[in-house]
Amino acid sequence: MPYIINDKTLALLPLGKKTKILEWDKDFIVEESIINIIEHNCILNGSTLEGRRKGSSYLIGASYKPPIIIDEMKRIILIPTHSNKNPNCKWFILDNILKYYLNTSNKVVVMFKNNQKLELDLCYANFDKQVLRATRLESSLRGRKYKKFL
């Protein structure tokens, strides 16, 4: 059975055809690709990865590297570091990121809400843009829910 992305998931990291999962209190490797995990989780929540990509693109106007909604009720939104077709693409759960910054080695450091840190060899501006897109998507979803109650 594929890994179920949940509120304790911090990040999904590629290891060839396997995936390293970072969770709140443990890290482990699963024998499945990131794309298969994400696709399965999208299907469990009533869509497909392509459907989620189109939905995100429509809501925030970003067609390249859009954030992906995994579970709208639990506010699980994935942030990709690259195109999902790139084998080096890492995925982060927006709600579990406390902060991120550029260190003295010019690497992006992501600090999660459990104080765990992950250093990435990425452009800070690109990562910042991805986080902002995901935040915009979350805000759009929240606004849509709020309008239902008015």
Which stretches of residues belong to each language-model region?
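Eukaryotic intrinsically disordered, low-complexity regulatory linkers and tails enriched in Ser/Thr/Pro
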Residues: 1-92, 96-150
